[in-house]
Amino acid sequence: MDPNTVSSFQDILMRMSKMQLESSSEDLNGMITQFESLKLYRDSLGEAVMRMGDLHSLQNRNGKWREQLGQKFEEIRWLIEEVRHRLKITENSFEQITFMQALQLLFEVEQEIRTFSFQLI
């Protein structure tokens, strides 16, 4: 796991939490929850790759891991679209920077998950 990605996740979540305090947007709450879920999934997949040979454990624990992987990619695509939309409509520079960083992070995480999944297949 790239330490920069981990700190990026923490930074984005902290920034979104600050934005959440200033707004009552349920969409933002959902985005934060999905970011947290995505981070946990990415971390667990990365740990499985690091333990190589853990594929059988992963498959036994979750026989539908490929389906789950597909769902995570759908979540990432949804988050990318949601972040792009937010970026277009916000005029607040703090929010713009946060959403630009979140977008970059999503692209990086999508690539990492693809790399991890190819190593597990």
From Swiss-Prot:
Keyword RNA-binding recorded: no
A GO biological process held by the record: exit of virus from host cell nucleus through nuclear pore
Main location: virion
Protein location: Virion; Host nucleus
Entry superkingdom: Viruses
Subunit structure: Interacts with protein M1. May interact with host nucleoporin RAB/HRB and exportin XPO1/CRM1.
Membership in a protein family: Belongs to the influenza viruses NEP family.
Protein name from the UniProt record: Nuclear export protein
Source organism of this protein record: Influenza A virus (strain A/Hickox/1940 H1N1)
Phylogenetic placement of the source organism: Viruses, Riboviria, Orthornavirae, Negarnaviricota, Polyploviricotina
The gene coding this protein: NS
